[in-house]
UniProtKB/Swiss-Prot annotation:
Keywords: Cell membrane, Membrane, Transmembrane, Transmembrane helix. This is CASP-like protein 2U11. Residues 53-91, 144-174 are extracellular. The keyword Membrane applies. It comes from Selaginella moellendorffii.
């Protein structure tokens, strides 16, 4: 009777030993993989943000005036602050950077102290939802920047929007690199979301298995 109780307590209950060990090993592997992925994601987003924020070029833009044989050239400096959509792009990257740094510190702290939150499904749910939001934020920011870049490259003759990349070639090149890196970061972020989802539902599987083992031991007693 006593040995059965010990076995049952070891497989299920408030602090199951065997289950904790299995979940703890999985938790450690999960934390290491997620730290590496988040670090890579952080580098990508920082590079994308730095490229856009520091991107500057001064050039001459032709302004046609009716009655004049030639357009008047005006000196302008191309920068992201001039376009509201690009401000959203930069702000979105900043939010993702802040979130990723906080999450990295949290995971590094858990690994360093050998802490665990495997029994707290609410934390796993919050992480999964927040990761998903960051992924969609990156994707939406990159989509907005792509549309603006297309208009800058091709113009919109129907509404008399002129091409600007012919006057700001360097700016548009750096701009394009930033957006491409942002799309890559979005893909990496969705890989992180996939790992978070796997970890979350793995917790349910392990706990359900522990419950079945407890019921089996109870039936044998």
């Amino acid at each position: 009777m006593d040995s059965s109780s010990k076995a049952m307590n070891g497989s299920a209950g408030g602090s199951p030993v065997g289950d904790d060990r299995k979940m703890g090993d999985h938790e450690h592997e999960f934390r290491i993989s997620i730290i590496l992925l988040r670090s890579f994601l952080l580098v990508l987003v920082i590079i994308s943000e730095a490229l856009m924020v520091t991107d500057r070029e001064t050039g001459s833009v032709p302004l046609p005036f009716f009655g004049l044989p030639r357009p008047v050239f005006v000196t302008k400096t191309a920068k992201y602050e001039l376009v509201t959509g690009l401000k959203f792009y930069v702000d979105a990257l900043g939010v993702v950077i802040g979130y990723t740094v906080l999450h990295l510190l949290f995971n590094i702290g858990l690994v360093a102290t050998k802490g665990t939150v495997v029994d707290c499904k609410s934390v796993a749910w919050i992480s999964f939802i927040a990761d998903s939001m960051m992924g969609y934020l990156l994707l939406s920011g990159a989509a907005v920047a792509t549309e603006i870049g297309y208009l800058a490259e091709e113009g919109a003759p129907a509404v008399l929007w002129r091409k600007v990349c012919n006057a700001f070639g360097y700016f548009c090149t750096v701009y394009a690199i930033s957006v491409v890196i942002c799309f890559i970061a979005a893909l990496v972020s969705f890989v992180v979301v996939g790992i978070s989802a796997y970890h979350l539902f793995r917790l349910y599987g392990i706990q359900q298995q522990a419950a079945r083992e407890k019921e089996k031991l109870s039936a044998e007693m």
